[in-house]
Amino acid sequence: MNSIQVKNEPMLASFASTSTNGKAKRSAKPSLFSGSEVSSDDDEEKPLAKRPKVEDSDSDAPLTSTVSSQNGVQKRSGSSNNDDNDDDSDSDSDAPLTALVKKSNGSDDDEDDDDDDDEGDDDDEEDDDDDDDDDDKPLSKSSKSNRKPPKTMSITGSGEKKWDVLIHKGPRFPDPYQPLPKDVKLKYDGRPVDLPWQTEEIAMFYAVKLETQHAQNAIFNRNFFDDFKTDLKKYPPRDGTQIKSFDKLDFRDMYNYWRSLKDAELERKKALAPSARKREIEERKAEETKWKICLVDGVEQRVGNVNVEPPGLFLGRGAHPKAGKVKRRISPGDITINHSADHPAPQPPAGMGDWAEVVEKKDVTWLAYWKENINGQYKYVFLDATSNFKTNSDREKFEKARKLDTVVKQIRRDVNKNLKSKVRHERQIATIVWLIDNFSLRAGNEKGEDEAETYGVCSLRCEHAQIKMPDTIHLEFLGKDSMKFEEDLKITNPDVFKNIAMFLKSNGMKDKSGNYVRKKPSDPIFCAPESGSGKMQPLQPNSVNQFLSKYMKGLSAKVFRTYNASVTFQGLLEQTEEWLKSRPNAAEREINQTNLRLAYNEANRQVAILCNHQKTVNPMLLNRNLERTQDKIFQIRYEIMKEQQKILTFHKVSELKKEFKVKEHPFMKQFDKIMQKQDLDAEKVKQYEEQMISDKKSKLESTFKRQQSELQYQLEQKGLTGDDGTPKKGKKAKNVEEEVRSSIKGFKDKKQVDEELKALNETAKRLEKERKTNKSQATSCNFVSSAKKILSKYEMIKKQEAELVNKNNTSDVALSTSKLNYIDPRITLAWLKEWDDRLSDLGQGKAAPKKKVKKEEEENDIKPKKKDAKGAASKKRAAKTGLANSTGDSEKMELGLQVMNISQFFANALQKKFKWAASGDDGRDISAKWVFVKDAQSKMRKLDSAERKGQKGGSMAAMTDAADSKEAQPKVNCVLKKQTSADRKMSKPIKAVDKTEESDDDLSSDSSDDEDKPLAAVV
């Protein structure tokens, strides 16, 4: 097979990166690992690796001889077809397969190429693709001496033809690197270093992260410097500088230059006329659309993320060991294109060489793939989430999870039976399935030493677990994407608890003396002897899926997670009204849109915790949120103080109490609160008022500049300016100019702006006088109005404080991941319809006045009006046929809601992705009575972790547990509480095994047989 040379060097505009011979190769089909696609869509298309089948014929034979690699070791045959292999992927198994897959973890979340990753909203987790396909991949060997390169297969699909004609433009490349000006240099030991552009670019990767949390990470810095030194050997400084110490590097000049470019671009955009800015955006979107549209069998389909990831530094998620390593620039010579052979293939950018290969694979749906250098993952360009391929995949995934409901009782009965099996392998599988089912843990994989050490149930080591009598297991390990999992799991099934304690102690094998071999901390909890060496290796997730597939074709651990997440979510939403009634104050108990959204988010939060959907905590963002909230609260308290000042200037407290009786004025019950002194720092009040006036002046001046820029731009477009840019004279030109002025929203001339600036100066003087005299300069005061304003502002403070608590409680919980990948969207839509009908019945169905105001404002806006009644046709069709979503009139779903706003629950991207969900099982518009499963509340899963991530006021699940504590299946009896760093510090050190004599006695006291003793290992 011809080899393809992967170009790791970054490129200049004039630098062409090619394959080995400088031309595109039509080589034999390259071998690939399974990897992740570029887009943030669900990875359901990625195929699973072919797996070796474990023969179970002698699984119950005891191991009576000494531990060795000779006879008595279980043999593994080659890969064989089974149900799990046939249908374990929830959709198109069309990405390249491998015979043995190196587990690729730590999907990079650093698509940005600057420090804006720390400035965005951390709740934007739609790019967190949380598939568990990795659960089904075979394990890599952990032994350094025995590790071999993985064997691979050629590109293969599912065998089923997906398309006849596929035409697209290929992936889009990032801009080439532009060298720095000669006066901007990296400094070493205080002296400028003359770097060639290849290493200068890598230094710039670090410079742009200088003011982020990443630059404070020792692992990040070490990995960067290691890669930087490697490149310095290839492209050393031209002035001969020897760079040996990271601490002597100074990136400040490079950062300042980059920051100046960012600031200049921001100022340029601010200076643009609104119409010019809008036109610029439209042109950019039009250019992007050329890349984002492809033809599949003559039908236009949207493509997902077509952009090749730009080079930079790998950020990773969690405590990723490869954070800071250099992501190399991808060239056309690294990319394979999938395209119709009878149509011209897309051309790579000029001067960058040819594609590695162009193929025609009609049984796959990827458009292109390439390999990234950090984790060896293959990244793919797929169609967009709204494409037919993806929407069908999503529906099939959730329908498979619904089908599980028909066999789940039988599975659980058999699991409970196998927990007491004499066959160790069966008992291990049953214990694993019980943990996956009850705690929604991932099956997981062991990693090689060159990969991020992350784990799931199957690959857990003894050092990850600690027995806590009488019924608790403490687990602490790095989960998917290097996110830390640390929980105390209360095991309600005594057999499970006893099994785990047993598996922690021994693998069932005996030494020469006939004693059971005690496990070491690094030994796997669930294990079987490896073929050939006899060494105990973690049980493969494939073993779990083989067990599950006996009950339903394609059933895997991930389907269980999807089923439990959706069932629990439905069960929680069914308790919405009860949860609202349980809220601590009257305002929170009201049935309205705001409180319903809080109830929905509470259910979403609990399911996210159930699935252990974490996200990287950004301390800088948390601090900014805290500062912003504190500033908002100070502003509100300042406004309260000014109202109080006004009241005390015009009224006496004693007279107010006499004049305004509680009977006629109920708000007087809170009179003491109304007049409570705010105790604001005088200097801070002065600074706030001065800043407030300054901000208003700046806003007024910037608005004036923007309006003048808009006026100039529109006159230029109409040809009414001279060569010097000044407006033309003449009656006609003047009339047109007046029309343009009137079309600009809120247009003010220079005279009006000067008058307002003068008024602001007067306000500043008035505020200064009020500070000195502590008397209001207002002309009058309406006490009732001021009192009600003060009380409303106290409520605003409560909301701000509650929002801050909510953000802190969910700072490490990825709410959107479960909604995107694990919760059937039809549950949300049916719930929305139900409550929309109820709110309409309560008289809350009238349109909000805000929309009318918006339309009136748009008449005077410079921007073109939006299309009115975009969904009117769909609503009329729905009224007649019940099929509002049967045609492609809109990319988003049409539910015909009168009160509830779907955008508050599903962002536009999710509405497009889940448009299929607006139709029920009968193909008609989804009904408010649609359910994922019947009797969901009795099937909800347990959630111990939420007991420490509780939210004051209780949770829906806590009510479920209190209402029916007799259910055999434990429910989500929890409240949510954010775990603090102090909580973690109080945790006891992890032990491989609880070796106390009391533990051994407790484990054996309730059994008359030898179930508590280590079972014989399979041979």
From Swiss-Prot:
GO biological process: chromosome segregation; DNA replication; DNA topological change
Record-linked InterPro entries: DNA_brk_join_enz (IPR011010), DNA_topo_DNA_db_N_dom1 (IPR013034), DNA_topo_DNA_db_N_dom2 (IPR013030), TopoI (IPR001631), TopoI_C_dom (IPR025834), TopoI_cat_a-hlx-sub_euk (IPR014711), TopoI_cat_a/b-sub_euk (IPR014727), TopoI_cat_euk (IPR013500)
CDD domains assigned to the protein according to its UniProt record, in alphabetical order: Topo_IB_C, Topoisomer_IB_N_htopoI_like
Domain Topo IB-type catalytic: 386-860
Biased composition (Polar residues): 62-78
Tagged with keyword Membrane: no
SMART domains for the chain: TOPEUc (SM00435)
Keyword Isomerase found: yes
Bias (Acidic residues): 83-93, 107-136, 997-1012
Biased amino acid composition, Basic and acidic residues: 46-56, 854-863, 940-950, 980-996
Catalytic residue positions: Y822 (o-(3'-phospho-dna)-tyrosine intermediate)
Purpose: Releases the supercoiling and torsional tension of DNA introduced during the DNA replication and transcription by transiently cleaving and rejoining one strand of the DNA duplex. Introduces a single-strand break via transesterification at a target site in duplex DNA. The scissile phosphodiester is attacked by the catalytic tyrosine of the enzyme, resulting in the formation of a DNA-(3'-phosphotyrosyl)-enzyme intermediate and the expulsion of a 5'-OH DNA strand. The free DNA strand then rotates around the intact phosphodiester bond on the opposing strand, thus removing DNA supercoils.
Additional information: Eukaryotic topoisomerase I and II can relax both negative and positive supercoils, whereas prokaryotic enzymes relax only negative supercoils.
Protein name: DNA topoisomerase 1
Organism: Mycosarcoma maydis
